[in-house]
Design a protein with these regions (language model features):
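A structural signal for well-ordered alpha-helical scaffolds and beta->alpha junctions
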Residues: 4-7, 52, 68-71, 99, ...
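Core AdoMet radical
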Residues: 1-4, 15-34, 41-72, 84-93, ...
Length: 186
């Protein structure tokens, strides 16, 4: 939304009418411009949900052509200005290797209040359940043993990782491979 003129038209009306609503915005942090920052400074209460599905190169793969350094810089700027900061995180086959690093990264930002996580089920091939159990289980175990996973902000994520860890369900690995080939072409 930070690049959409329509959002700024609405925010302009709010400012012109001297209103002070609580604003809630979700952003993938790829673009945080000066105009957006000025609006964040105006509102006394703001909830910003950072849509971030990985750490470092994993995020760059999932959100190509994004650059993690830019996303991290923008997330830090937003965290300093917003009154409430959360992360929306999608657990998927493409970030399961990166869970431990992601948990550590989130833990370093003291302003992040909560990680709202979901397990992806579509498109076909993206769920961690498409990965073989003997591959995914050690990765999930590593994340579940992370010293930070017991912090309140990770409650839902921990429940979902535990579910995946205990699951004996395995979907068609070829669906994951075929989808990956399609993604890698683009």
């Amino acid at each position: 939304p930070t690049i959409m003129n329509e959002m700024y038209k609405i925010l302009d009306m709010v400012v012109e009418n001297k209103q002070q609503p609580i604003i809630a915005i979700t952003t993938n942090c790829t673009n945080v411009n000066k105009r957006f920052i000025e609006y964040l400074k105006y509102f006394k209460e703001s909830t910003i949900n950072l849509s971030i599905d990985g750490f470092g190169p994993t995020l760059e793969y999932i959100r190509h052509p994004a650059h993690f350094d830019t996303i991290e810089k923008n997330a830090n700027i937003i965290s300093e200005l917003a009154t409430d900061v959360n992360i929306n995180f999608v657990i998927q086959a493409y970030n399961i290797e990166n869970l431990n690093d992601f948990i550590d990264w989130v833990s370093k930002n003291k302003k992040i209040y909560n990680v709202h996580s979901v397990i992806v089920h579509t498109p076909r091939g993206t769920s961690p359940l498409y990965l073989p159990i003997d591959y995914r289980k050690p990765l999930l175990e590593k994340a579940l043993n992370n010293k930070n996973i017991n912090k309140r902000r990770f409650t839902k994520l921990k429940q979902q990782l535990t579910y995946l860890y205990n699951s004996t369900e395995v979907l068609a690995f070829n669906d994951f491979l075929n989808l990956t080939l399609i993604f890698d072409e683009h």
